[in-house]
């Protein structure tokens, strides 16, 4: 459904469809090259459609990957927080050094930053996906 919406809203596809209409309007079987112009415009339209599908699929996969990454970073943050609790107890009992304790604190801070970064990546990917549904896609097809 979202892909259909993206194809419907794509300027690139509209542009190539317009070129096909224009080529058909200029078509005259008695004039050399007009049949080739129609065929060329149709081929360009097919390539544009494939390019939009590929770009939309890539955008969708990016959102999925970012969701997975965010979940993994949250799990890593939870583990770092548990490790810090353990390190706190060990430090208070004199089992580990202050450096080891501070490294556990740093690991928690790093994990929190990684979660924030993953969240921002997901947010960006989702916004790109929403724009893709509106037909704003980065494609490799020539304009």
Predicted features by range, described:
Residues 26-31, 52, 88-91, 136:
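Secondary-structure edge/capping motif, primarily at the C-terminal ends of alpha-helices
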Residues 3-48, 70, 77-80, 101-105, ...:
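Amphipathic, heptad-repeat alpha-helical/coiled-coil signature enriched at exported N-termini
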Residues 52, 59, 94-98:
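Alpha-helical heptad-repeat coiled-coil segments that mediate oligomerization/polymerization in large
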Residues 117-143:
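Acidic, low-complexity, intrinsically disordered peripheral segments
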Residues 68-115, 130-131:
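Charged, solvent-exposed structural "stalk/scaffold" segments
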Residues 54-55, 69:
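C-terminal structural cap/anchor segments
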Residues 42-53, 141-143:
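Short, charge-rich amphipathic alpha-helices with coiled-coil/heptad character
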């Amino acid at each position: 459904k979202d892909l259909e919406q993206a194809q419907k809203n794509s300027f690139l596809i509209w542009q190539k469809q317009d070129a096909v209409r224009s080529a058909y309007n200029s078509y005259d079987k008695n004039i050399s090259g007009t049949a080739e112009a129609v065929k060329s415009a149709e081929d360009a339209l097919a390539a544009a459609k494939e390019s939009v599908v590929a770009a939309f699929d890539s955008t969708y996969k990016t959102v999925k990957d970012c969701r997975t990454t965010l979940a993994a970073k949250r799990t890593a943050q939870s583990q770092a927080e548990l490790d810090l609790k353990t390190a706190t107890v060990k430090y208070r009992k004199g089992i580990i050094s202050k450096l080891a304790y501070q490294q556990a604190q740093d690991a928690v801070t790093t994990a929190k930053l990684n979660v924030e970064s993953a969240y921002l990546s997901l947010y960006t990917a989702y916004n790109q996906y929403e724009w893709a549904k509106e037909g704003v896609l980065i494609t490799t097809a020539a304009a």
